[in-house]
UniProtKB/Swiss-Prot annotation:
Active site, UniProt feature: Y185 (proton acceptor), K189 (lowers pka of active site tyr)
Disruption phenotype: Abolishes the production of asperiene C, asperiene A, calidoustene A, (6-Strobilactone-B) ester of (E,E)-6-carbonyl-7-hydroxy-2,4-octadienoic acid, ustusolate C, ustusolide E and calidoustene B. Still produces ustusoic acid A, ustusolate A, (2'E,4'E)-6-(1'-carboxyhexa-2',4',-diene)-9-hydroxy-drim-7-ene-11,12-olide, calidoustene C and RES-1149-2, all compounds with fully unsaturated acyl chains.
Primary gene name: drtF
InterPro entries recorded: NAD(P)-bd_dom_sf (IPR036291), SDR_fam (IPR002347)
Name of the featured protein: Short-chain dehydrogenase/reductase drtF
Residue intervals passing through the bilayer: none
Positions that bind NADP(+): V26, K50, D73, N100, Y185, K189
Entry EC no(s): 1.1.1.-
Native source organism of the sequence: Aspergillus calidoustus
């Protein structure tokens, strides 16, 4: 049996959650912990086979686990929109969204939508997913009587956001074709933090009444983990082997702690909404650009405009 969580987590019976990238690594353990506590959890993933295998593993330990596969391909924005619509056909409530899926330091590649792979997978697809789920998130908050912390959105980011370009988000060259793999990764992770902060500003507990305040948000760094994410990187395999040998990586389950804490624990308070968390459920200031609210607003506007051009927000 796994050790107890390092924070309080009550029964989540009657609550519904969606976790992207839920079939592996941090996402898998996030789904597992929520399901163990009685929640209904949707596992967002691209591969039906891998998702069903992951669900089978969860149910082997927790036979009553209420976990369901929701197909989505984050490298295809239309697939993400379709996934959001599919979810809303199945459920009328969503208490928590964990934008978890991601890739790290991968070789330069463009999606079919024309965006650099890390930018789209880590940031852009999660923005559009959240956008299309805002209506059900708001309805859930209303159904819960506006109860504090009853609806939350968590963006999984990284301390790798410090590798971003000096400007944070390079709107003049959003795909960063000539930059290094970690600069592109860093930009996407800055995007995650700014998304959580702007979402909190618009829909969070400090927002206006007209913005339907009350959705709590957070950006969380899971830590340096021994997951499949490291296998995707462009640097040599011996680097991962060395880091693993010297104990530089934590177990994937530990990486899920911040996500579960932020999306469901009563120990996460209203003052925590919109903040950046590092391992140990500790708040920390992110980089200067990642806490620039003017940049957060500009990025939100840029993203909305780009997606409207592609008729993805209608």
């Amino acid at each position: 049996m796994a050790p107890a969580l390092p924070f309080a987590l009550p029964s989540l019976a009657g609550k519904v959650y969606l976790v992207t990238g839920g079939n592996t690594g941090v996402g898998f353990h996030t789904v597992d912990e929520l399901a163990k506590h009685g929640a209904r959890v949707y596992m967002g993933a691209r591969s039906p086979g891998k998702a069903e295998a992951a669900i089978k593993t969860i149910r082997a330990e927790t036979p009553t686990a209420d976990v369901h596969f929701l197909q989505m391909d984050l490298m295809d924005l239309h697939s993400v929109v379709a996934a959001a619509k599919s979810f809303k056909e199945k459920e009328t409530k969503l208490h928590g969204l964990v934008n978890n899926a991601g890739i790290m330091a991968t070789p330069y590649a463009l999606s079919g939508d024309g965006f650099e792979a890390q930018w789209q997978t880590n940031y852009l697809s999660h923005w559009v997913l959240t956008w299309h789920l805002l209506d059900v998130l708001v309805r859930t908050l209303q159904a819960e009587g506006g109860a504090a912390g009853s609806v939350r959105v968590v963006d999984v980011t990284s301390d790798g956001h410090n590798f971003a370009p000096k400007v944070g988000i390079d709107f003049k060259d959003i795909n960063l074709e000539k930059a290094g793999v970690f600069a592109r990764y860093g930009q996407s992770k800055v995007g995650n933090i700014l998304h959580a902060k702007q979402l909190n500003k618009l829909y969070g507990p400090s927002g206006s009444e007209t913005a339907k305040k009350g959705i709590w948000t957070a950006a969380v760094h899971p830590g340096h983990l021994d997951t499949n994410l490291n296998k995707q990187t462009a640097f040599p395999k011996f680097v991962n082997t060395l880091l693993r040998a010297v104990g530089a990586y934590s177990p994937p389950r530990d990486g899920a702690f911040n996500s579960v804490f932020a999306v469901a624990s009563p120990e996460f308070k209203v003052a925590d909404s919109g903040e950046y968390f590092v391992p140990g459920q500790k708040k920390k200031q992110p980089s200067k650009v990642a806490r620039d609210m003017e940049l957060a607003g500009r990025l939100w506007k840029w993203t909305e405009e780009e997606l409207r051009k592609r008729e993805l927000l209608d």
